[in-house]
Regions:
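Short conserved micro-motifs on helix faces and helix-strand junctions that flank
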Residues: 10-17, 74, 129, 185, ...
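Amphipathic alpha-helical blocks
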Residues: 14, 26-52
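Residues immediately flanking
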Residues: 19, 86, 131-133
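Reverse-transcriptase-like RNA-dependent polymerase core
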Residues: 8, 40-66, 75, 79-87, ...
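Charged boundary/loop elements
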Residues: 1-13, 86-99
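Conserved phosphate-binding loops in nucleotide/dinucleotide-binding enzymes
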Residues: 69-70
Length: 222
């Protein structure tokens, strides 16, 4: 929990407040023991279990004139998400494709470009396919995501219950209306990039089975 706090504090976004108007300084003003106790109480102490506070929706301008929706969880909920990420990430990393570079530790766009260039030279192939999944974060199927998490070997029912609550946290829109989501994972949530990679993991391995293991491609590689 304290490691999660330090990781969040290192990010300047931790000073951005959620719907409860609090930021990282409100956590930092408490003793380490009190922070640990508070997190444990939020997660397991209430009668109905963990209930994240409404996520603040903010529209971020894009260069093309459109906007990108950003979901800003309250700071204590961000701390809980960071704890979950630290638990799940090592398990998931062991199951992810080596050719996946998005939102992963010690991997970047530059690594992906270098890998692509190397493969083009080795295979004597000269085509790269680029595509975008429209509205990906807003359309993640919750039930399928939970099944995918389970298939990766994460079977702790309390943890899965908390993830379900995170996915269905109320969203406070810019016009002050509240939306109860039944799909998607908000861009801006600490755990959202990891959940996105879990959703796309099956696609990564399917692509590998279609092309990476293609005998013709292997022959050309030689």
């Amino acid at each position: 929990i304290l490691l999660a706090y330090r990781n969040i504090k290192a990010n300047k976004g931790s000073y951005t407040a959620g719907t409860d108007k609090k930021n990282i300084t409100d956590i930092g003003s408490q003793t380490p023991d009190d922070v640990v106790k508070r997190v444990r109480f939020i997660v397991t102490g209430s009668e109905h279990g963990y209930r994240p506070k409404p996520v603040r929706r903010k529209d971020i301008p894009k260069p093309n004139g459109k906007t990108r929706p950003l979901g800003i969880p309250c700071i204590w909920d961000r701390l809980i998400q960071q704890c979950i990420k630290q638990i799940m990430e090592p398990i998931c990393e062991a199951k992810f494709s080596n050719n996946s570079y998005g939102f992963r530790l010690n991997r970047s766009v530059e690594h992906a470009i270098n890998r692509t260039y190397t493969m083009l030279q080795m295979m004597n192939l000269h085509y790269v396919i680029e595509f975008d999944i429209k509205g990906f974060f807003d359309n993640v199927n919750h039930s399928k995501l939970i099944r995918q998490i389970w298939s990766l070997g994460i079977h702790d029912k309390t943890l899965i219950f908390i993830i379900k609550r995170i996915l269905t946290a109320p969203i406070k829109m810019p016009d002050n209306t509240t939306v109860l989501p039944n799909k998607g994972t908000p861009q801006g949530g600490i755990i959202s990039p990891l959940l996105a990679n879990i959703v796309l993991n099956e696609l990564d391995w399917w692509i590998a089975s279609q092309w990476e293991e293609n005998p013709i491609a292997i022959s050309r590689g030689r």
